[in-house]
UniProtKB/Swiss-Prot annotation:
GO terms for cellular component: cytoplasm; nucleus. The F-box is necessary for the interaction with ASK proteins. It comes from Arabidopsis thaliana. Expressed in seedling, root, stem, leaves, inflorescence and silique, especially in veins and trichomes. Keywords: Cytoplasm, Hypersensitive response, Nucleus, Plant defense, Ubl conjugation pathway. PANTHER family: BNACNNG10540D PROTEIN (PTHR31672), F-BOX PROTEIN CPR30-LIKE (PTHR31672:SF13). Part of a SCF (ASK-cullin-F-box) protein ligase complex. Interacts with SKP1A/ASK1, SPK1B/ASK2, ASK9, ASK10, ASK11, ASK13, ASK14, ASK16, ASK17, ASK18 and ASK19. Interacts with TRAF1B. It is found in: Cytoplasm; Nucleus. GO terms for biological process: negative regulation of defense response; negative regulation of protein catabolic process; plant-type hypersensitive response; protein ubiquitination. This is F-box protein CPR1. InterPro entries: F-box-assoc_dom_typ1, F-box-assoc_interact_dom, F-box-like_dom_sf, F-box_dom, SCF_F-box_component.
C-alpha cells in the first residue's frame, strides 16, 4: 500500500461502500487517518449522493431490522444495533446515511448502519400541560440542517385534554428539537395552530405516516381530511433552520377538489413528492421540482392498482433505477416492486429471507456521524473494537502461515 500514491488511494476509497472503508482503516495509519478525515467523509457522501452507488433498503420487520443492497436485491442481512433487541424499536427517518431509532419518546438514538456508530439522545421529559389527562400520539422526524451543518431530531407530543370538543380533533402539542451538534434539546414555544388538527387516528397509525418526510431542509407531515370536520388535506412543514412551521401549497389541479383524495408524501430524486390516491383505483404522483415553489409541481407518473393486490391503500416511491426507466415502489408495507415508466408494468422483488410485512427506508452508505459515537454506550463500542482486533489478529496469523508455507514450498523445490 505504501508504494501507491495517496491521491490514487483517495480516489479508490471514494468509490467504496462505507462498510468496506471501515475495514480498510486497519490497513495502515495513513489509511486510517484518510478515512477518518472530515473532508474525505464529506467527499465520499457527496459522491454517493451524486452517483446513487451503494444504496440500501432498510426493512423494519415485526421484531428486527434488515438491510438489502439495492445493487443486488438478492437477500437480506440483519442490522445489529445496540438499542433493545426483540422489542418495538422503530425507524423514524433517514438522512445522509443516518437513521433515527425509537424505543419510546424518551429513548431515542441516531444510528449509522454502515459504520454501526450510534448516539443515544439524552432523555427529554414530557411535561403534561394544565388540564391534560394523558399523553397521546407522538410524531418524529430526523433531518440534516444544511444552514447550521447539524443533524436534528424533531419530537411532537400530542396531549389529550378533557374538554367539550365533540369531534376530539383539536389537541395541544409539545414540540422539541434535538441538536446533534449541541447534544441538547430545545422546546419550540411558537407552534402553528394548524398543528392542533394534525393527528387523525385512522390515518397516522398506518404506514408510518407519523414520521416526517425530509426535503428542502424541512420535515413534512400530512394533515389529512376527516369526516365531521370542515378541513382539506394539508402538508405541514417544519423548517429545520428557522425551526418554524409553515404550510406547503398543493398543485392547483389538486387543491381545487382534494376533499375526496387520500394523500401521502415522500421523496424521490431528492424532491418532495405528493401521492394522490383516488378510491384505491389509481395513484397520481406529483413532484415539486423546485422546493417551495408551487408552480414547480409536476405530475410525473400514474400507477394503476395492480391486479395482484387486494388493497391499494398505500403506495410510496423510493428511488429511480440508474437508467431512470423504472422506479422502486413500496406497496402496503408488504412488497417492493419495480414500476416500468414506459410499459406501466410491475415486477415484484423476490428477496430471500425477507419478512412478510415490513416498512422500507432508503439509506445511503456513508461514514457520517457528527457526534462521533455514543458516550453512553462504551460497552458496545469496546465489544466492537475487541471484535475488530480479533479479526485483524486472525488475518495476521493467516498471512504469517501462508508466508511460512510459501517459503517451505520454495525450499523443497
Amino acid at each position: 500500500m505504501a508504494t501507491i500514491p495517496m491521491d490514487i488511494v483517495n480516489d479508490i476509497f471514494l468509490r467504496l461502500p462505507a462498510k468496506t472503508l471501515v475495514r480498510c482503516r486497519a490497513l495502515s495509519k495513513p489509511c486510517y487517518h484518510l478515512i477518518n478525515d472530515p473532508d474525505f467523509i464529506e467527499s465520499h457522501l457527496h459522491r454517493v449522493l451524486q452517483t446513487g452507488d451503494h444504496l440500501m433498503i432498510l426493512l423494519r420487520g415485526a421484531l428486527r431490522l434488515y438491510s438489502v443492497d439495492l445493487d443486488s436485491l438478492d437477500s437480506v442481512s440483519d442490522v445489529e444495533h445496540p438499542m433493545k433487541r426483540g422489542g418495538p424499536t422503530e425507524v423514524f427517518g433517514s438522512s445522509n446515511g443516518l437513521i433515527g431509532l425509537s424505543n419510546s419518546p424518551t429513548d431515542l438514538a441516531v444510528f449509522n448502519p454502515s459504520t454501526r456508530q450510534i448516539h443515544r439522545l439524552p432523555p427529554s421529559s414530557i411535561d403534561l400541560p394544565d388540564g391534560s389527562s394523558t399523553r397521546g400520539y407522538v410524531f418524529y422526524g430526523l433531518g440534516y440542517d444544511s444552514v447550521s451543518d447539524d443533524y436534528k431530531v424533531v419530537r411532537m407530543v400530542q396531549f389529550k385534554i378533557d374538554s367539550e370538543d365533540e369531534l376530539g380533533c383539536s389537541f395541544p402539542y409539545e414540540v422539541k428539537v434535538f441538536s446533534l451538534k449541541k447534544n441538547s434539546w430545545k422546546r419550540i414555544e411558537s407552534v402553528a395552530s394548524s398543528i392542533q388538527l394534525l393527528f387523525y387516528f385512522y390515518y397516522h397509525l398506518l404506514y408510518r405516516r407519523g414520521y416526517g418526510v425530509l426535503a428542502g431542509n424541512s420535515l413534512h407531515w400530512v394533515l389529512p381530511r376527516r369526516p365531521g370536520l370542515i378541513a382539506f388535506n394539508l402538508i405541514v412543514r417544519f423548517d429545520l433552520a428557522l425551526e418554524e412551521f409553515e404550510i406547503v401549497r398543493f398543485p392547483e389541479a389538486v387543491a381545487n377538489g382534494n376533499v375526496d383524495i387520500q394523500m401521502d408524501i415522500g421523496v424521490l430524486d431528492g424532491c418532495l413528492c405528493l401521492m394522490c390516491n383516488y378510491d384505491q383505483s389509481y395513484v397520481d404522483v406529483w413532484m415539486m421540482k423546485e422546493y417551495n415553489v408551487r408552480d414547480s409541481w409536476t405530475k410525473v407518473f400514474t400507477v394503476q392498482k395492480p391486479k395482484s393486490v387486494k388493497s391499494f391503500s398505500y403506495m410510496r416511491p423510493l428511488v429511480y433505477s440508474k437508467d431512470k426507466k423504472k422506479v422502486l415502489l413500496e406497496l402496503n408495507n408488504t412488497k417492493l416492486v419495480w414500476f416500468d415508466l414506459e410499459s406501466k408494468k410491475m415486477s415484484t422483488l423476490r428477496i430471500k429471507d425477507c419478512p412478510s410485512s415490513y416498512s422500507a427506508e432508503l439509506v445511503v452508505s456513508s461514514l457520517v456521524l457528527g457526534c462521533k459515537g455514543d458516550l453512553n454506550n462504551i460497552k458496545y463500542r469496546k465489544e466492537q473494537q475487541a471484535k475488530e482486533a480479533r479479526e485483524a489478529k486472525i488475518m495476521q496469523n493467516t498471512k504469517r502461515r501462508d508466508d511460512f508455507l510459501s517459503k517451505g514450498f520454495k525450499l523443497v523445490l
